């Protein structure tokens, strides 16, 4: 397993080396600011990153968003009548939360290597044991 640093989220995620080489981390605030990233920041998101996946054909795909919140701010941002805006809480530590948003479905053929990698990565991003505080 290889640690992939999620900075500025103060965690890394451990993934198999053959998957890690396909990943890049993009700071949402500095590289792709949008109305949504501004809304997340106003809701209390301390850090926001995308996990991007580079497919075998060289195309880059957004895989998941990672959000780092104070627990109280994350809970305040939730509406029980709607899907979670900033994803699902995966790690809660020291009154802080790491939440993951996405992916909904794989865009890859499940029998392809990219499809298999995507399925493995999906399992890992929702497993609290995959994350290590940095």
Q: Model-found features: residue ranges?
A:
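Short, conserved beta-strand/beta-arch hydrophobic-aromatic motifs that form part
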Residues: 55-83
């Amino acid at each position: 397993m290889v640690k992939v640093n999620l900075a500025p989220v103060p965690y890394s995620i451990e993934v198999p080396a053959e998957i890690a080489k396909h990943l890049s981390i993009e700071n949402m605030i500095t590289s792709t600011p949008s109305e949504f990233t501004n809304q997340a920041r106003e809701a209390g998101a301390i850090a926001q990153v995308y996990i991007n996946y580079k497919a075998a054909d060289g195309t880059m795909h957004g895989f998941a968003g990672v959000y780092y919140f104070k627990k109280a701010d994350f809970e305040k941002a939730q509406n029980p009548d709607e899907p979670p805006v900033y994803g699902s809480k995966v790690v809660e530590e020291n009154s802080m939360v790491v939440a993951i948003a996405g992916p909904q479905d794989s865009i890859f053929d499940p029998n392809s290597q990219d499809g298999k990698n995507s399925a493995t990565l999906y399992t890992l991003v929702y497993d609290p044991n995959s994350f290590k505080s940095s």
